[in-house]
């Protein structure tokens, strides 16, 4: 049987052997934090390593998402220098709340594979799971940086929690010319009934903005012991909100390698959407990532 062709909408690479620094990954990998112990992924991860993990599938193109580097332009230039088709597109890091952010945006935009930027904005009242000390979406300086994305034709990869979806919706509506790509299935970390309703309602609201699309990825980060059945409602809930035309699958490797193999993850995706039409499946696994990341 021929391998399914996929475009991975979300993965990472890093070279820890040649001076590229990722403090979140390297400083204390044995700590049992939100993501679990990082020891097994605290090593260089290059295109060949990624393709070995993805060997059950034919990865025809891929999108590299910034991995919170200490030097964002150095990371993007390194990725560009790899020269291969993996990655095909790059989403770089930009701290939108800093005074010199426009220099960063201009430097990213000058590189041919760059399509957008990401700055993780997950804010949560629980200090064990928050990624930021305050809600950046409500910060005036951050919003001013976001407003510059149109000038450089850059999309924004939005990694946030359900409690921030109303804010992201308002921002997307204020800047309809900027494409927002929701990361990691909206990160449904809280599983009590009220929180699940907040996630469902937030996904529907975000989807009502035409310039917002979604990636189904990163579910292992919020449920380390995931199963096909446990992630099913989040996969189908995302597709129900955004439709098969505005949803795409991503691996989040090697981070989600902490919680399972690439093959297990994609087989779970295939099982969950087995009743979808071939056209719908191709959108989810391949065509939508090509469309929204312009590859």
Regions found by a protein language model. Give the residues of each.
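Mid-to-C-terminal alpha-helical segments outside catalytic/metal-binding sites
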Residues: 2-9, 18-56, 61, 237, ...
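Conserved, mostly hydrophobic/aromatic
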Residues: 10, 62, 90, 117, ...
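Acidic-and-aromatic substrate-binding clefts and catalytic sites of carbohydrate-active enzymes
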Residues: 41, 68-74, 94-102, 160-166, ...
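Catalytic pocket-lining loop regions of alpha/beta-barrel enzymes
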Residues: 132-248
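Active-site gating/metal-coordination segments in enzymes
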Residues: 70-163, 170, 215-222
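Generic structural signal for well-ordered alpha-helices
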Residues: 47-51, 76-80, 101-106, 142-146, ...
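Histidine-centered catalytic micro-motifs
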Residues: 6-16, 182-185
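Divalent metal-dependent hydrolysis catalytic cores, especially in the metallo-beta-lactamase
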Residues: 29-43, 48-70, 87-95, 115-122, ...
């Amino acid at each position: 049987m021929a391998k399914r062709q996929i475009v991975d909408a979300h993965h990472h690479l890093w070279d820890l052997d040649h001076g590229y620094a990722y403090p979140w990954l390297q400083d204390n990998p044995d700590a049992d934090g939100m993501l679990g112990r990082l020891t097994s992924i605290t090593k260089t991860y290059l295109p060949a390593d990624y393709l070995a993990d993805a060997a059950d599938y034919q990865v025809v193109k891929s999108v590299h998402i910034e991995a919170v580097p200490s030097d964002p332009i150095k990371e993007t230039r390194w990725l560009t220098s790899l020269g291969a088709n993996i990655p095909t597109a790059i989403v770089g890091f930009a701290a939108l709340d800093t005074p010199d952010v426009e220099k960063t945006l201009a430097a990213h935009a000058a590189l041919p594979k760059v399509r957008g930027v990401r700055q993780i904005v997950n804010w949560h009242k629980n200090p064990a799971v928050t990624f930021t000390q305050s809600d950046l979406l409500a910060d005036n300086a951050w919003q001013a940086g976001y407003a510059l994305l149109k000038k450089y034709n850059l999309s924004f990869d939005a990694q946030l929690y359900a409690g921030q979806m109303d804010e992201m919706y308002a921002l997307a509506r204020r800047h309809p010319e900027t494409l927002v790509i929701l990361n990691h299935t909206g990160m449904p970390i809280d599983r009590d009934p009220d929180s699940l309703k907040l996630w469902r309602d937030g996904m529907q609201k975000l989807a009502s903005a035409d310039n917002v699309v979604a990636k189904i990825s990163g579910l292992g980060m919020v449920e380390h012991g995931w199963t096909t059945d446990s992630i099913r409602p989040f996969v189908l809930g995302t597709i129900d909100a955004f439709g098969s035309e505005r949803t795409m699958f991503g691996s989040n490797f090697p981070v989600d390698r902490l919680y399972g193999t690439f093959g297990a993850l994609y087989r779970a995706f295939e099982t969950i959407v087995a009743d979808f039409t071939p056209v719908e499946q191709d959108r989810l696994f391949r065509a939508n990532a090509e469309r929204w990341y312009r590859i």
